[in-house]
Design a protein with these regions (language model features):
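Flexible helix-coil linker/hinge segments at domain or subdomain boundaries
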Residues: 24, 113-116, 153-166
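Short, low-complexity, polybasic intrinsically disordered segments
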Residues: 138-161
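GHKL/Histidine-kinase-like ATPase module
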Residues: 2, 8-14, 18-145
Length: 166
């Protein structure tokens, strides 16, 4: 019987391991002689992904609560919306946690600057936003964990929009 071999794309595996470090603040992974770590979690992700340190409209806002972390800013040189989301340390393709965060950011900016007539589109233009949540029993829309459909940050914790707004 012939042994089966798995082949991995080095770059893809490296990217996956790096995302685990971003979503799990303090995690250190050694891979192929390289130490991977993101001591500042999602803040490190934001700093790595933005085009340059001078490319922000304001410093990255990084908040942590029980069972979640967020980081966001607006890009000075691009109007594209950029999102990264994680559930229990695994990258997702968005979901209820990301939508709740987007709603909270829009609501906070609109209420903080009532004299300006900002639309949701105006507020989200150029945003770089990332979120990581830990949920005991997450509910996903697909078996491959692509999109979170749970509505709470954690079973015991506050809803994300309430936490950010406070």
């Amino acid at each position: 019987m012939e042994a089966a071999y798995l082949r991995f794309q080095q770059a893809s595996l490296f990217h996956l391991l790096r995302s685990y470090c971003h979503a799990n603040r303090g995690l250190i992974i050694r891979y192929d002689g390289t130490k991977l770590a993101a001591p500042d979690g999602l803040l490190d992700l934001a700093m790595e992904k933005m085009s340059s340190p001078n490319g922000y409209l304001y410093p990255v806002i990084n908040l942590q609560g029980k069972g979640f972390e967020i980081a966001f800013t607006h890009n000075k040189y691009s109007e594209a919306e950029t999102y990264y989301s994680f559930v229990n340390g695994i990258k997702t393709e968005g979901g209820s946690h990301l939508e709740a965060l987007k709603e909270a950011v829009v609501r906070i900016i609109a209420e903080t600057f009532p004299e300006n007539v900002f639309t949701t589109e105006d507020i989200l233009k150029g945003i770089f936003l990332t979120i990581s949540v830990d949920i005991a029993e997450p509910v996903f829309s697909q078996s491959c964990r692509g999109v979170l459909v749970s509505s709470r940050v954690s079973p015991d914790g506050p809803e994300l929009t309430d936490f950010i707004y406070e």
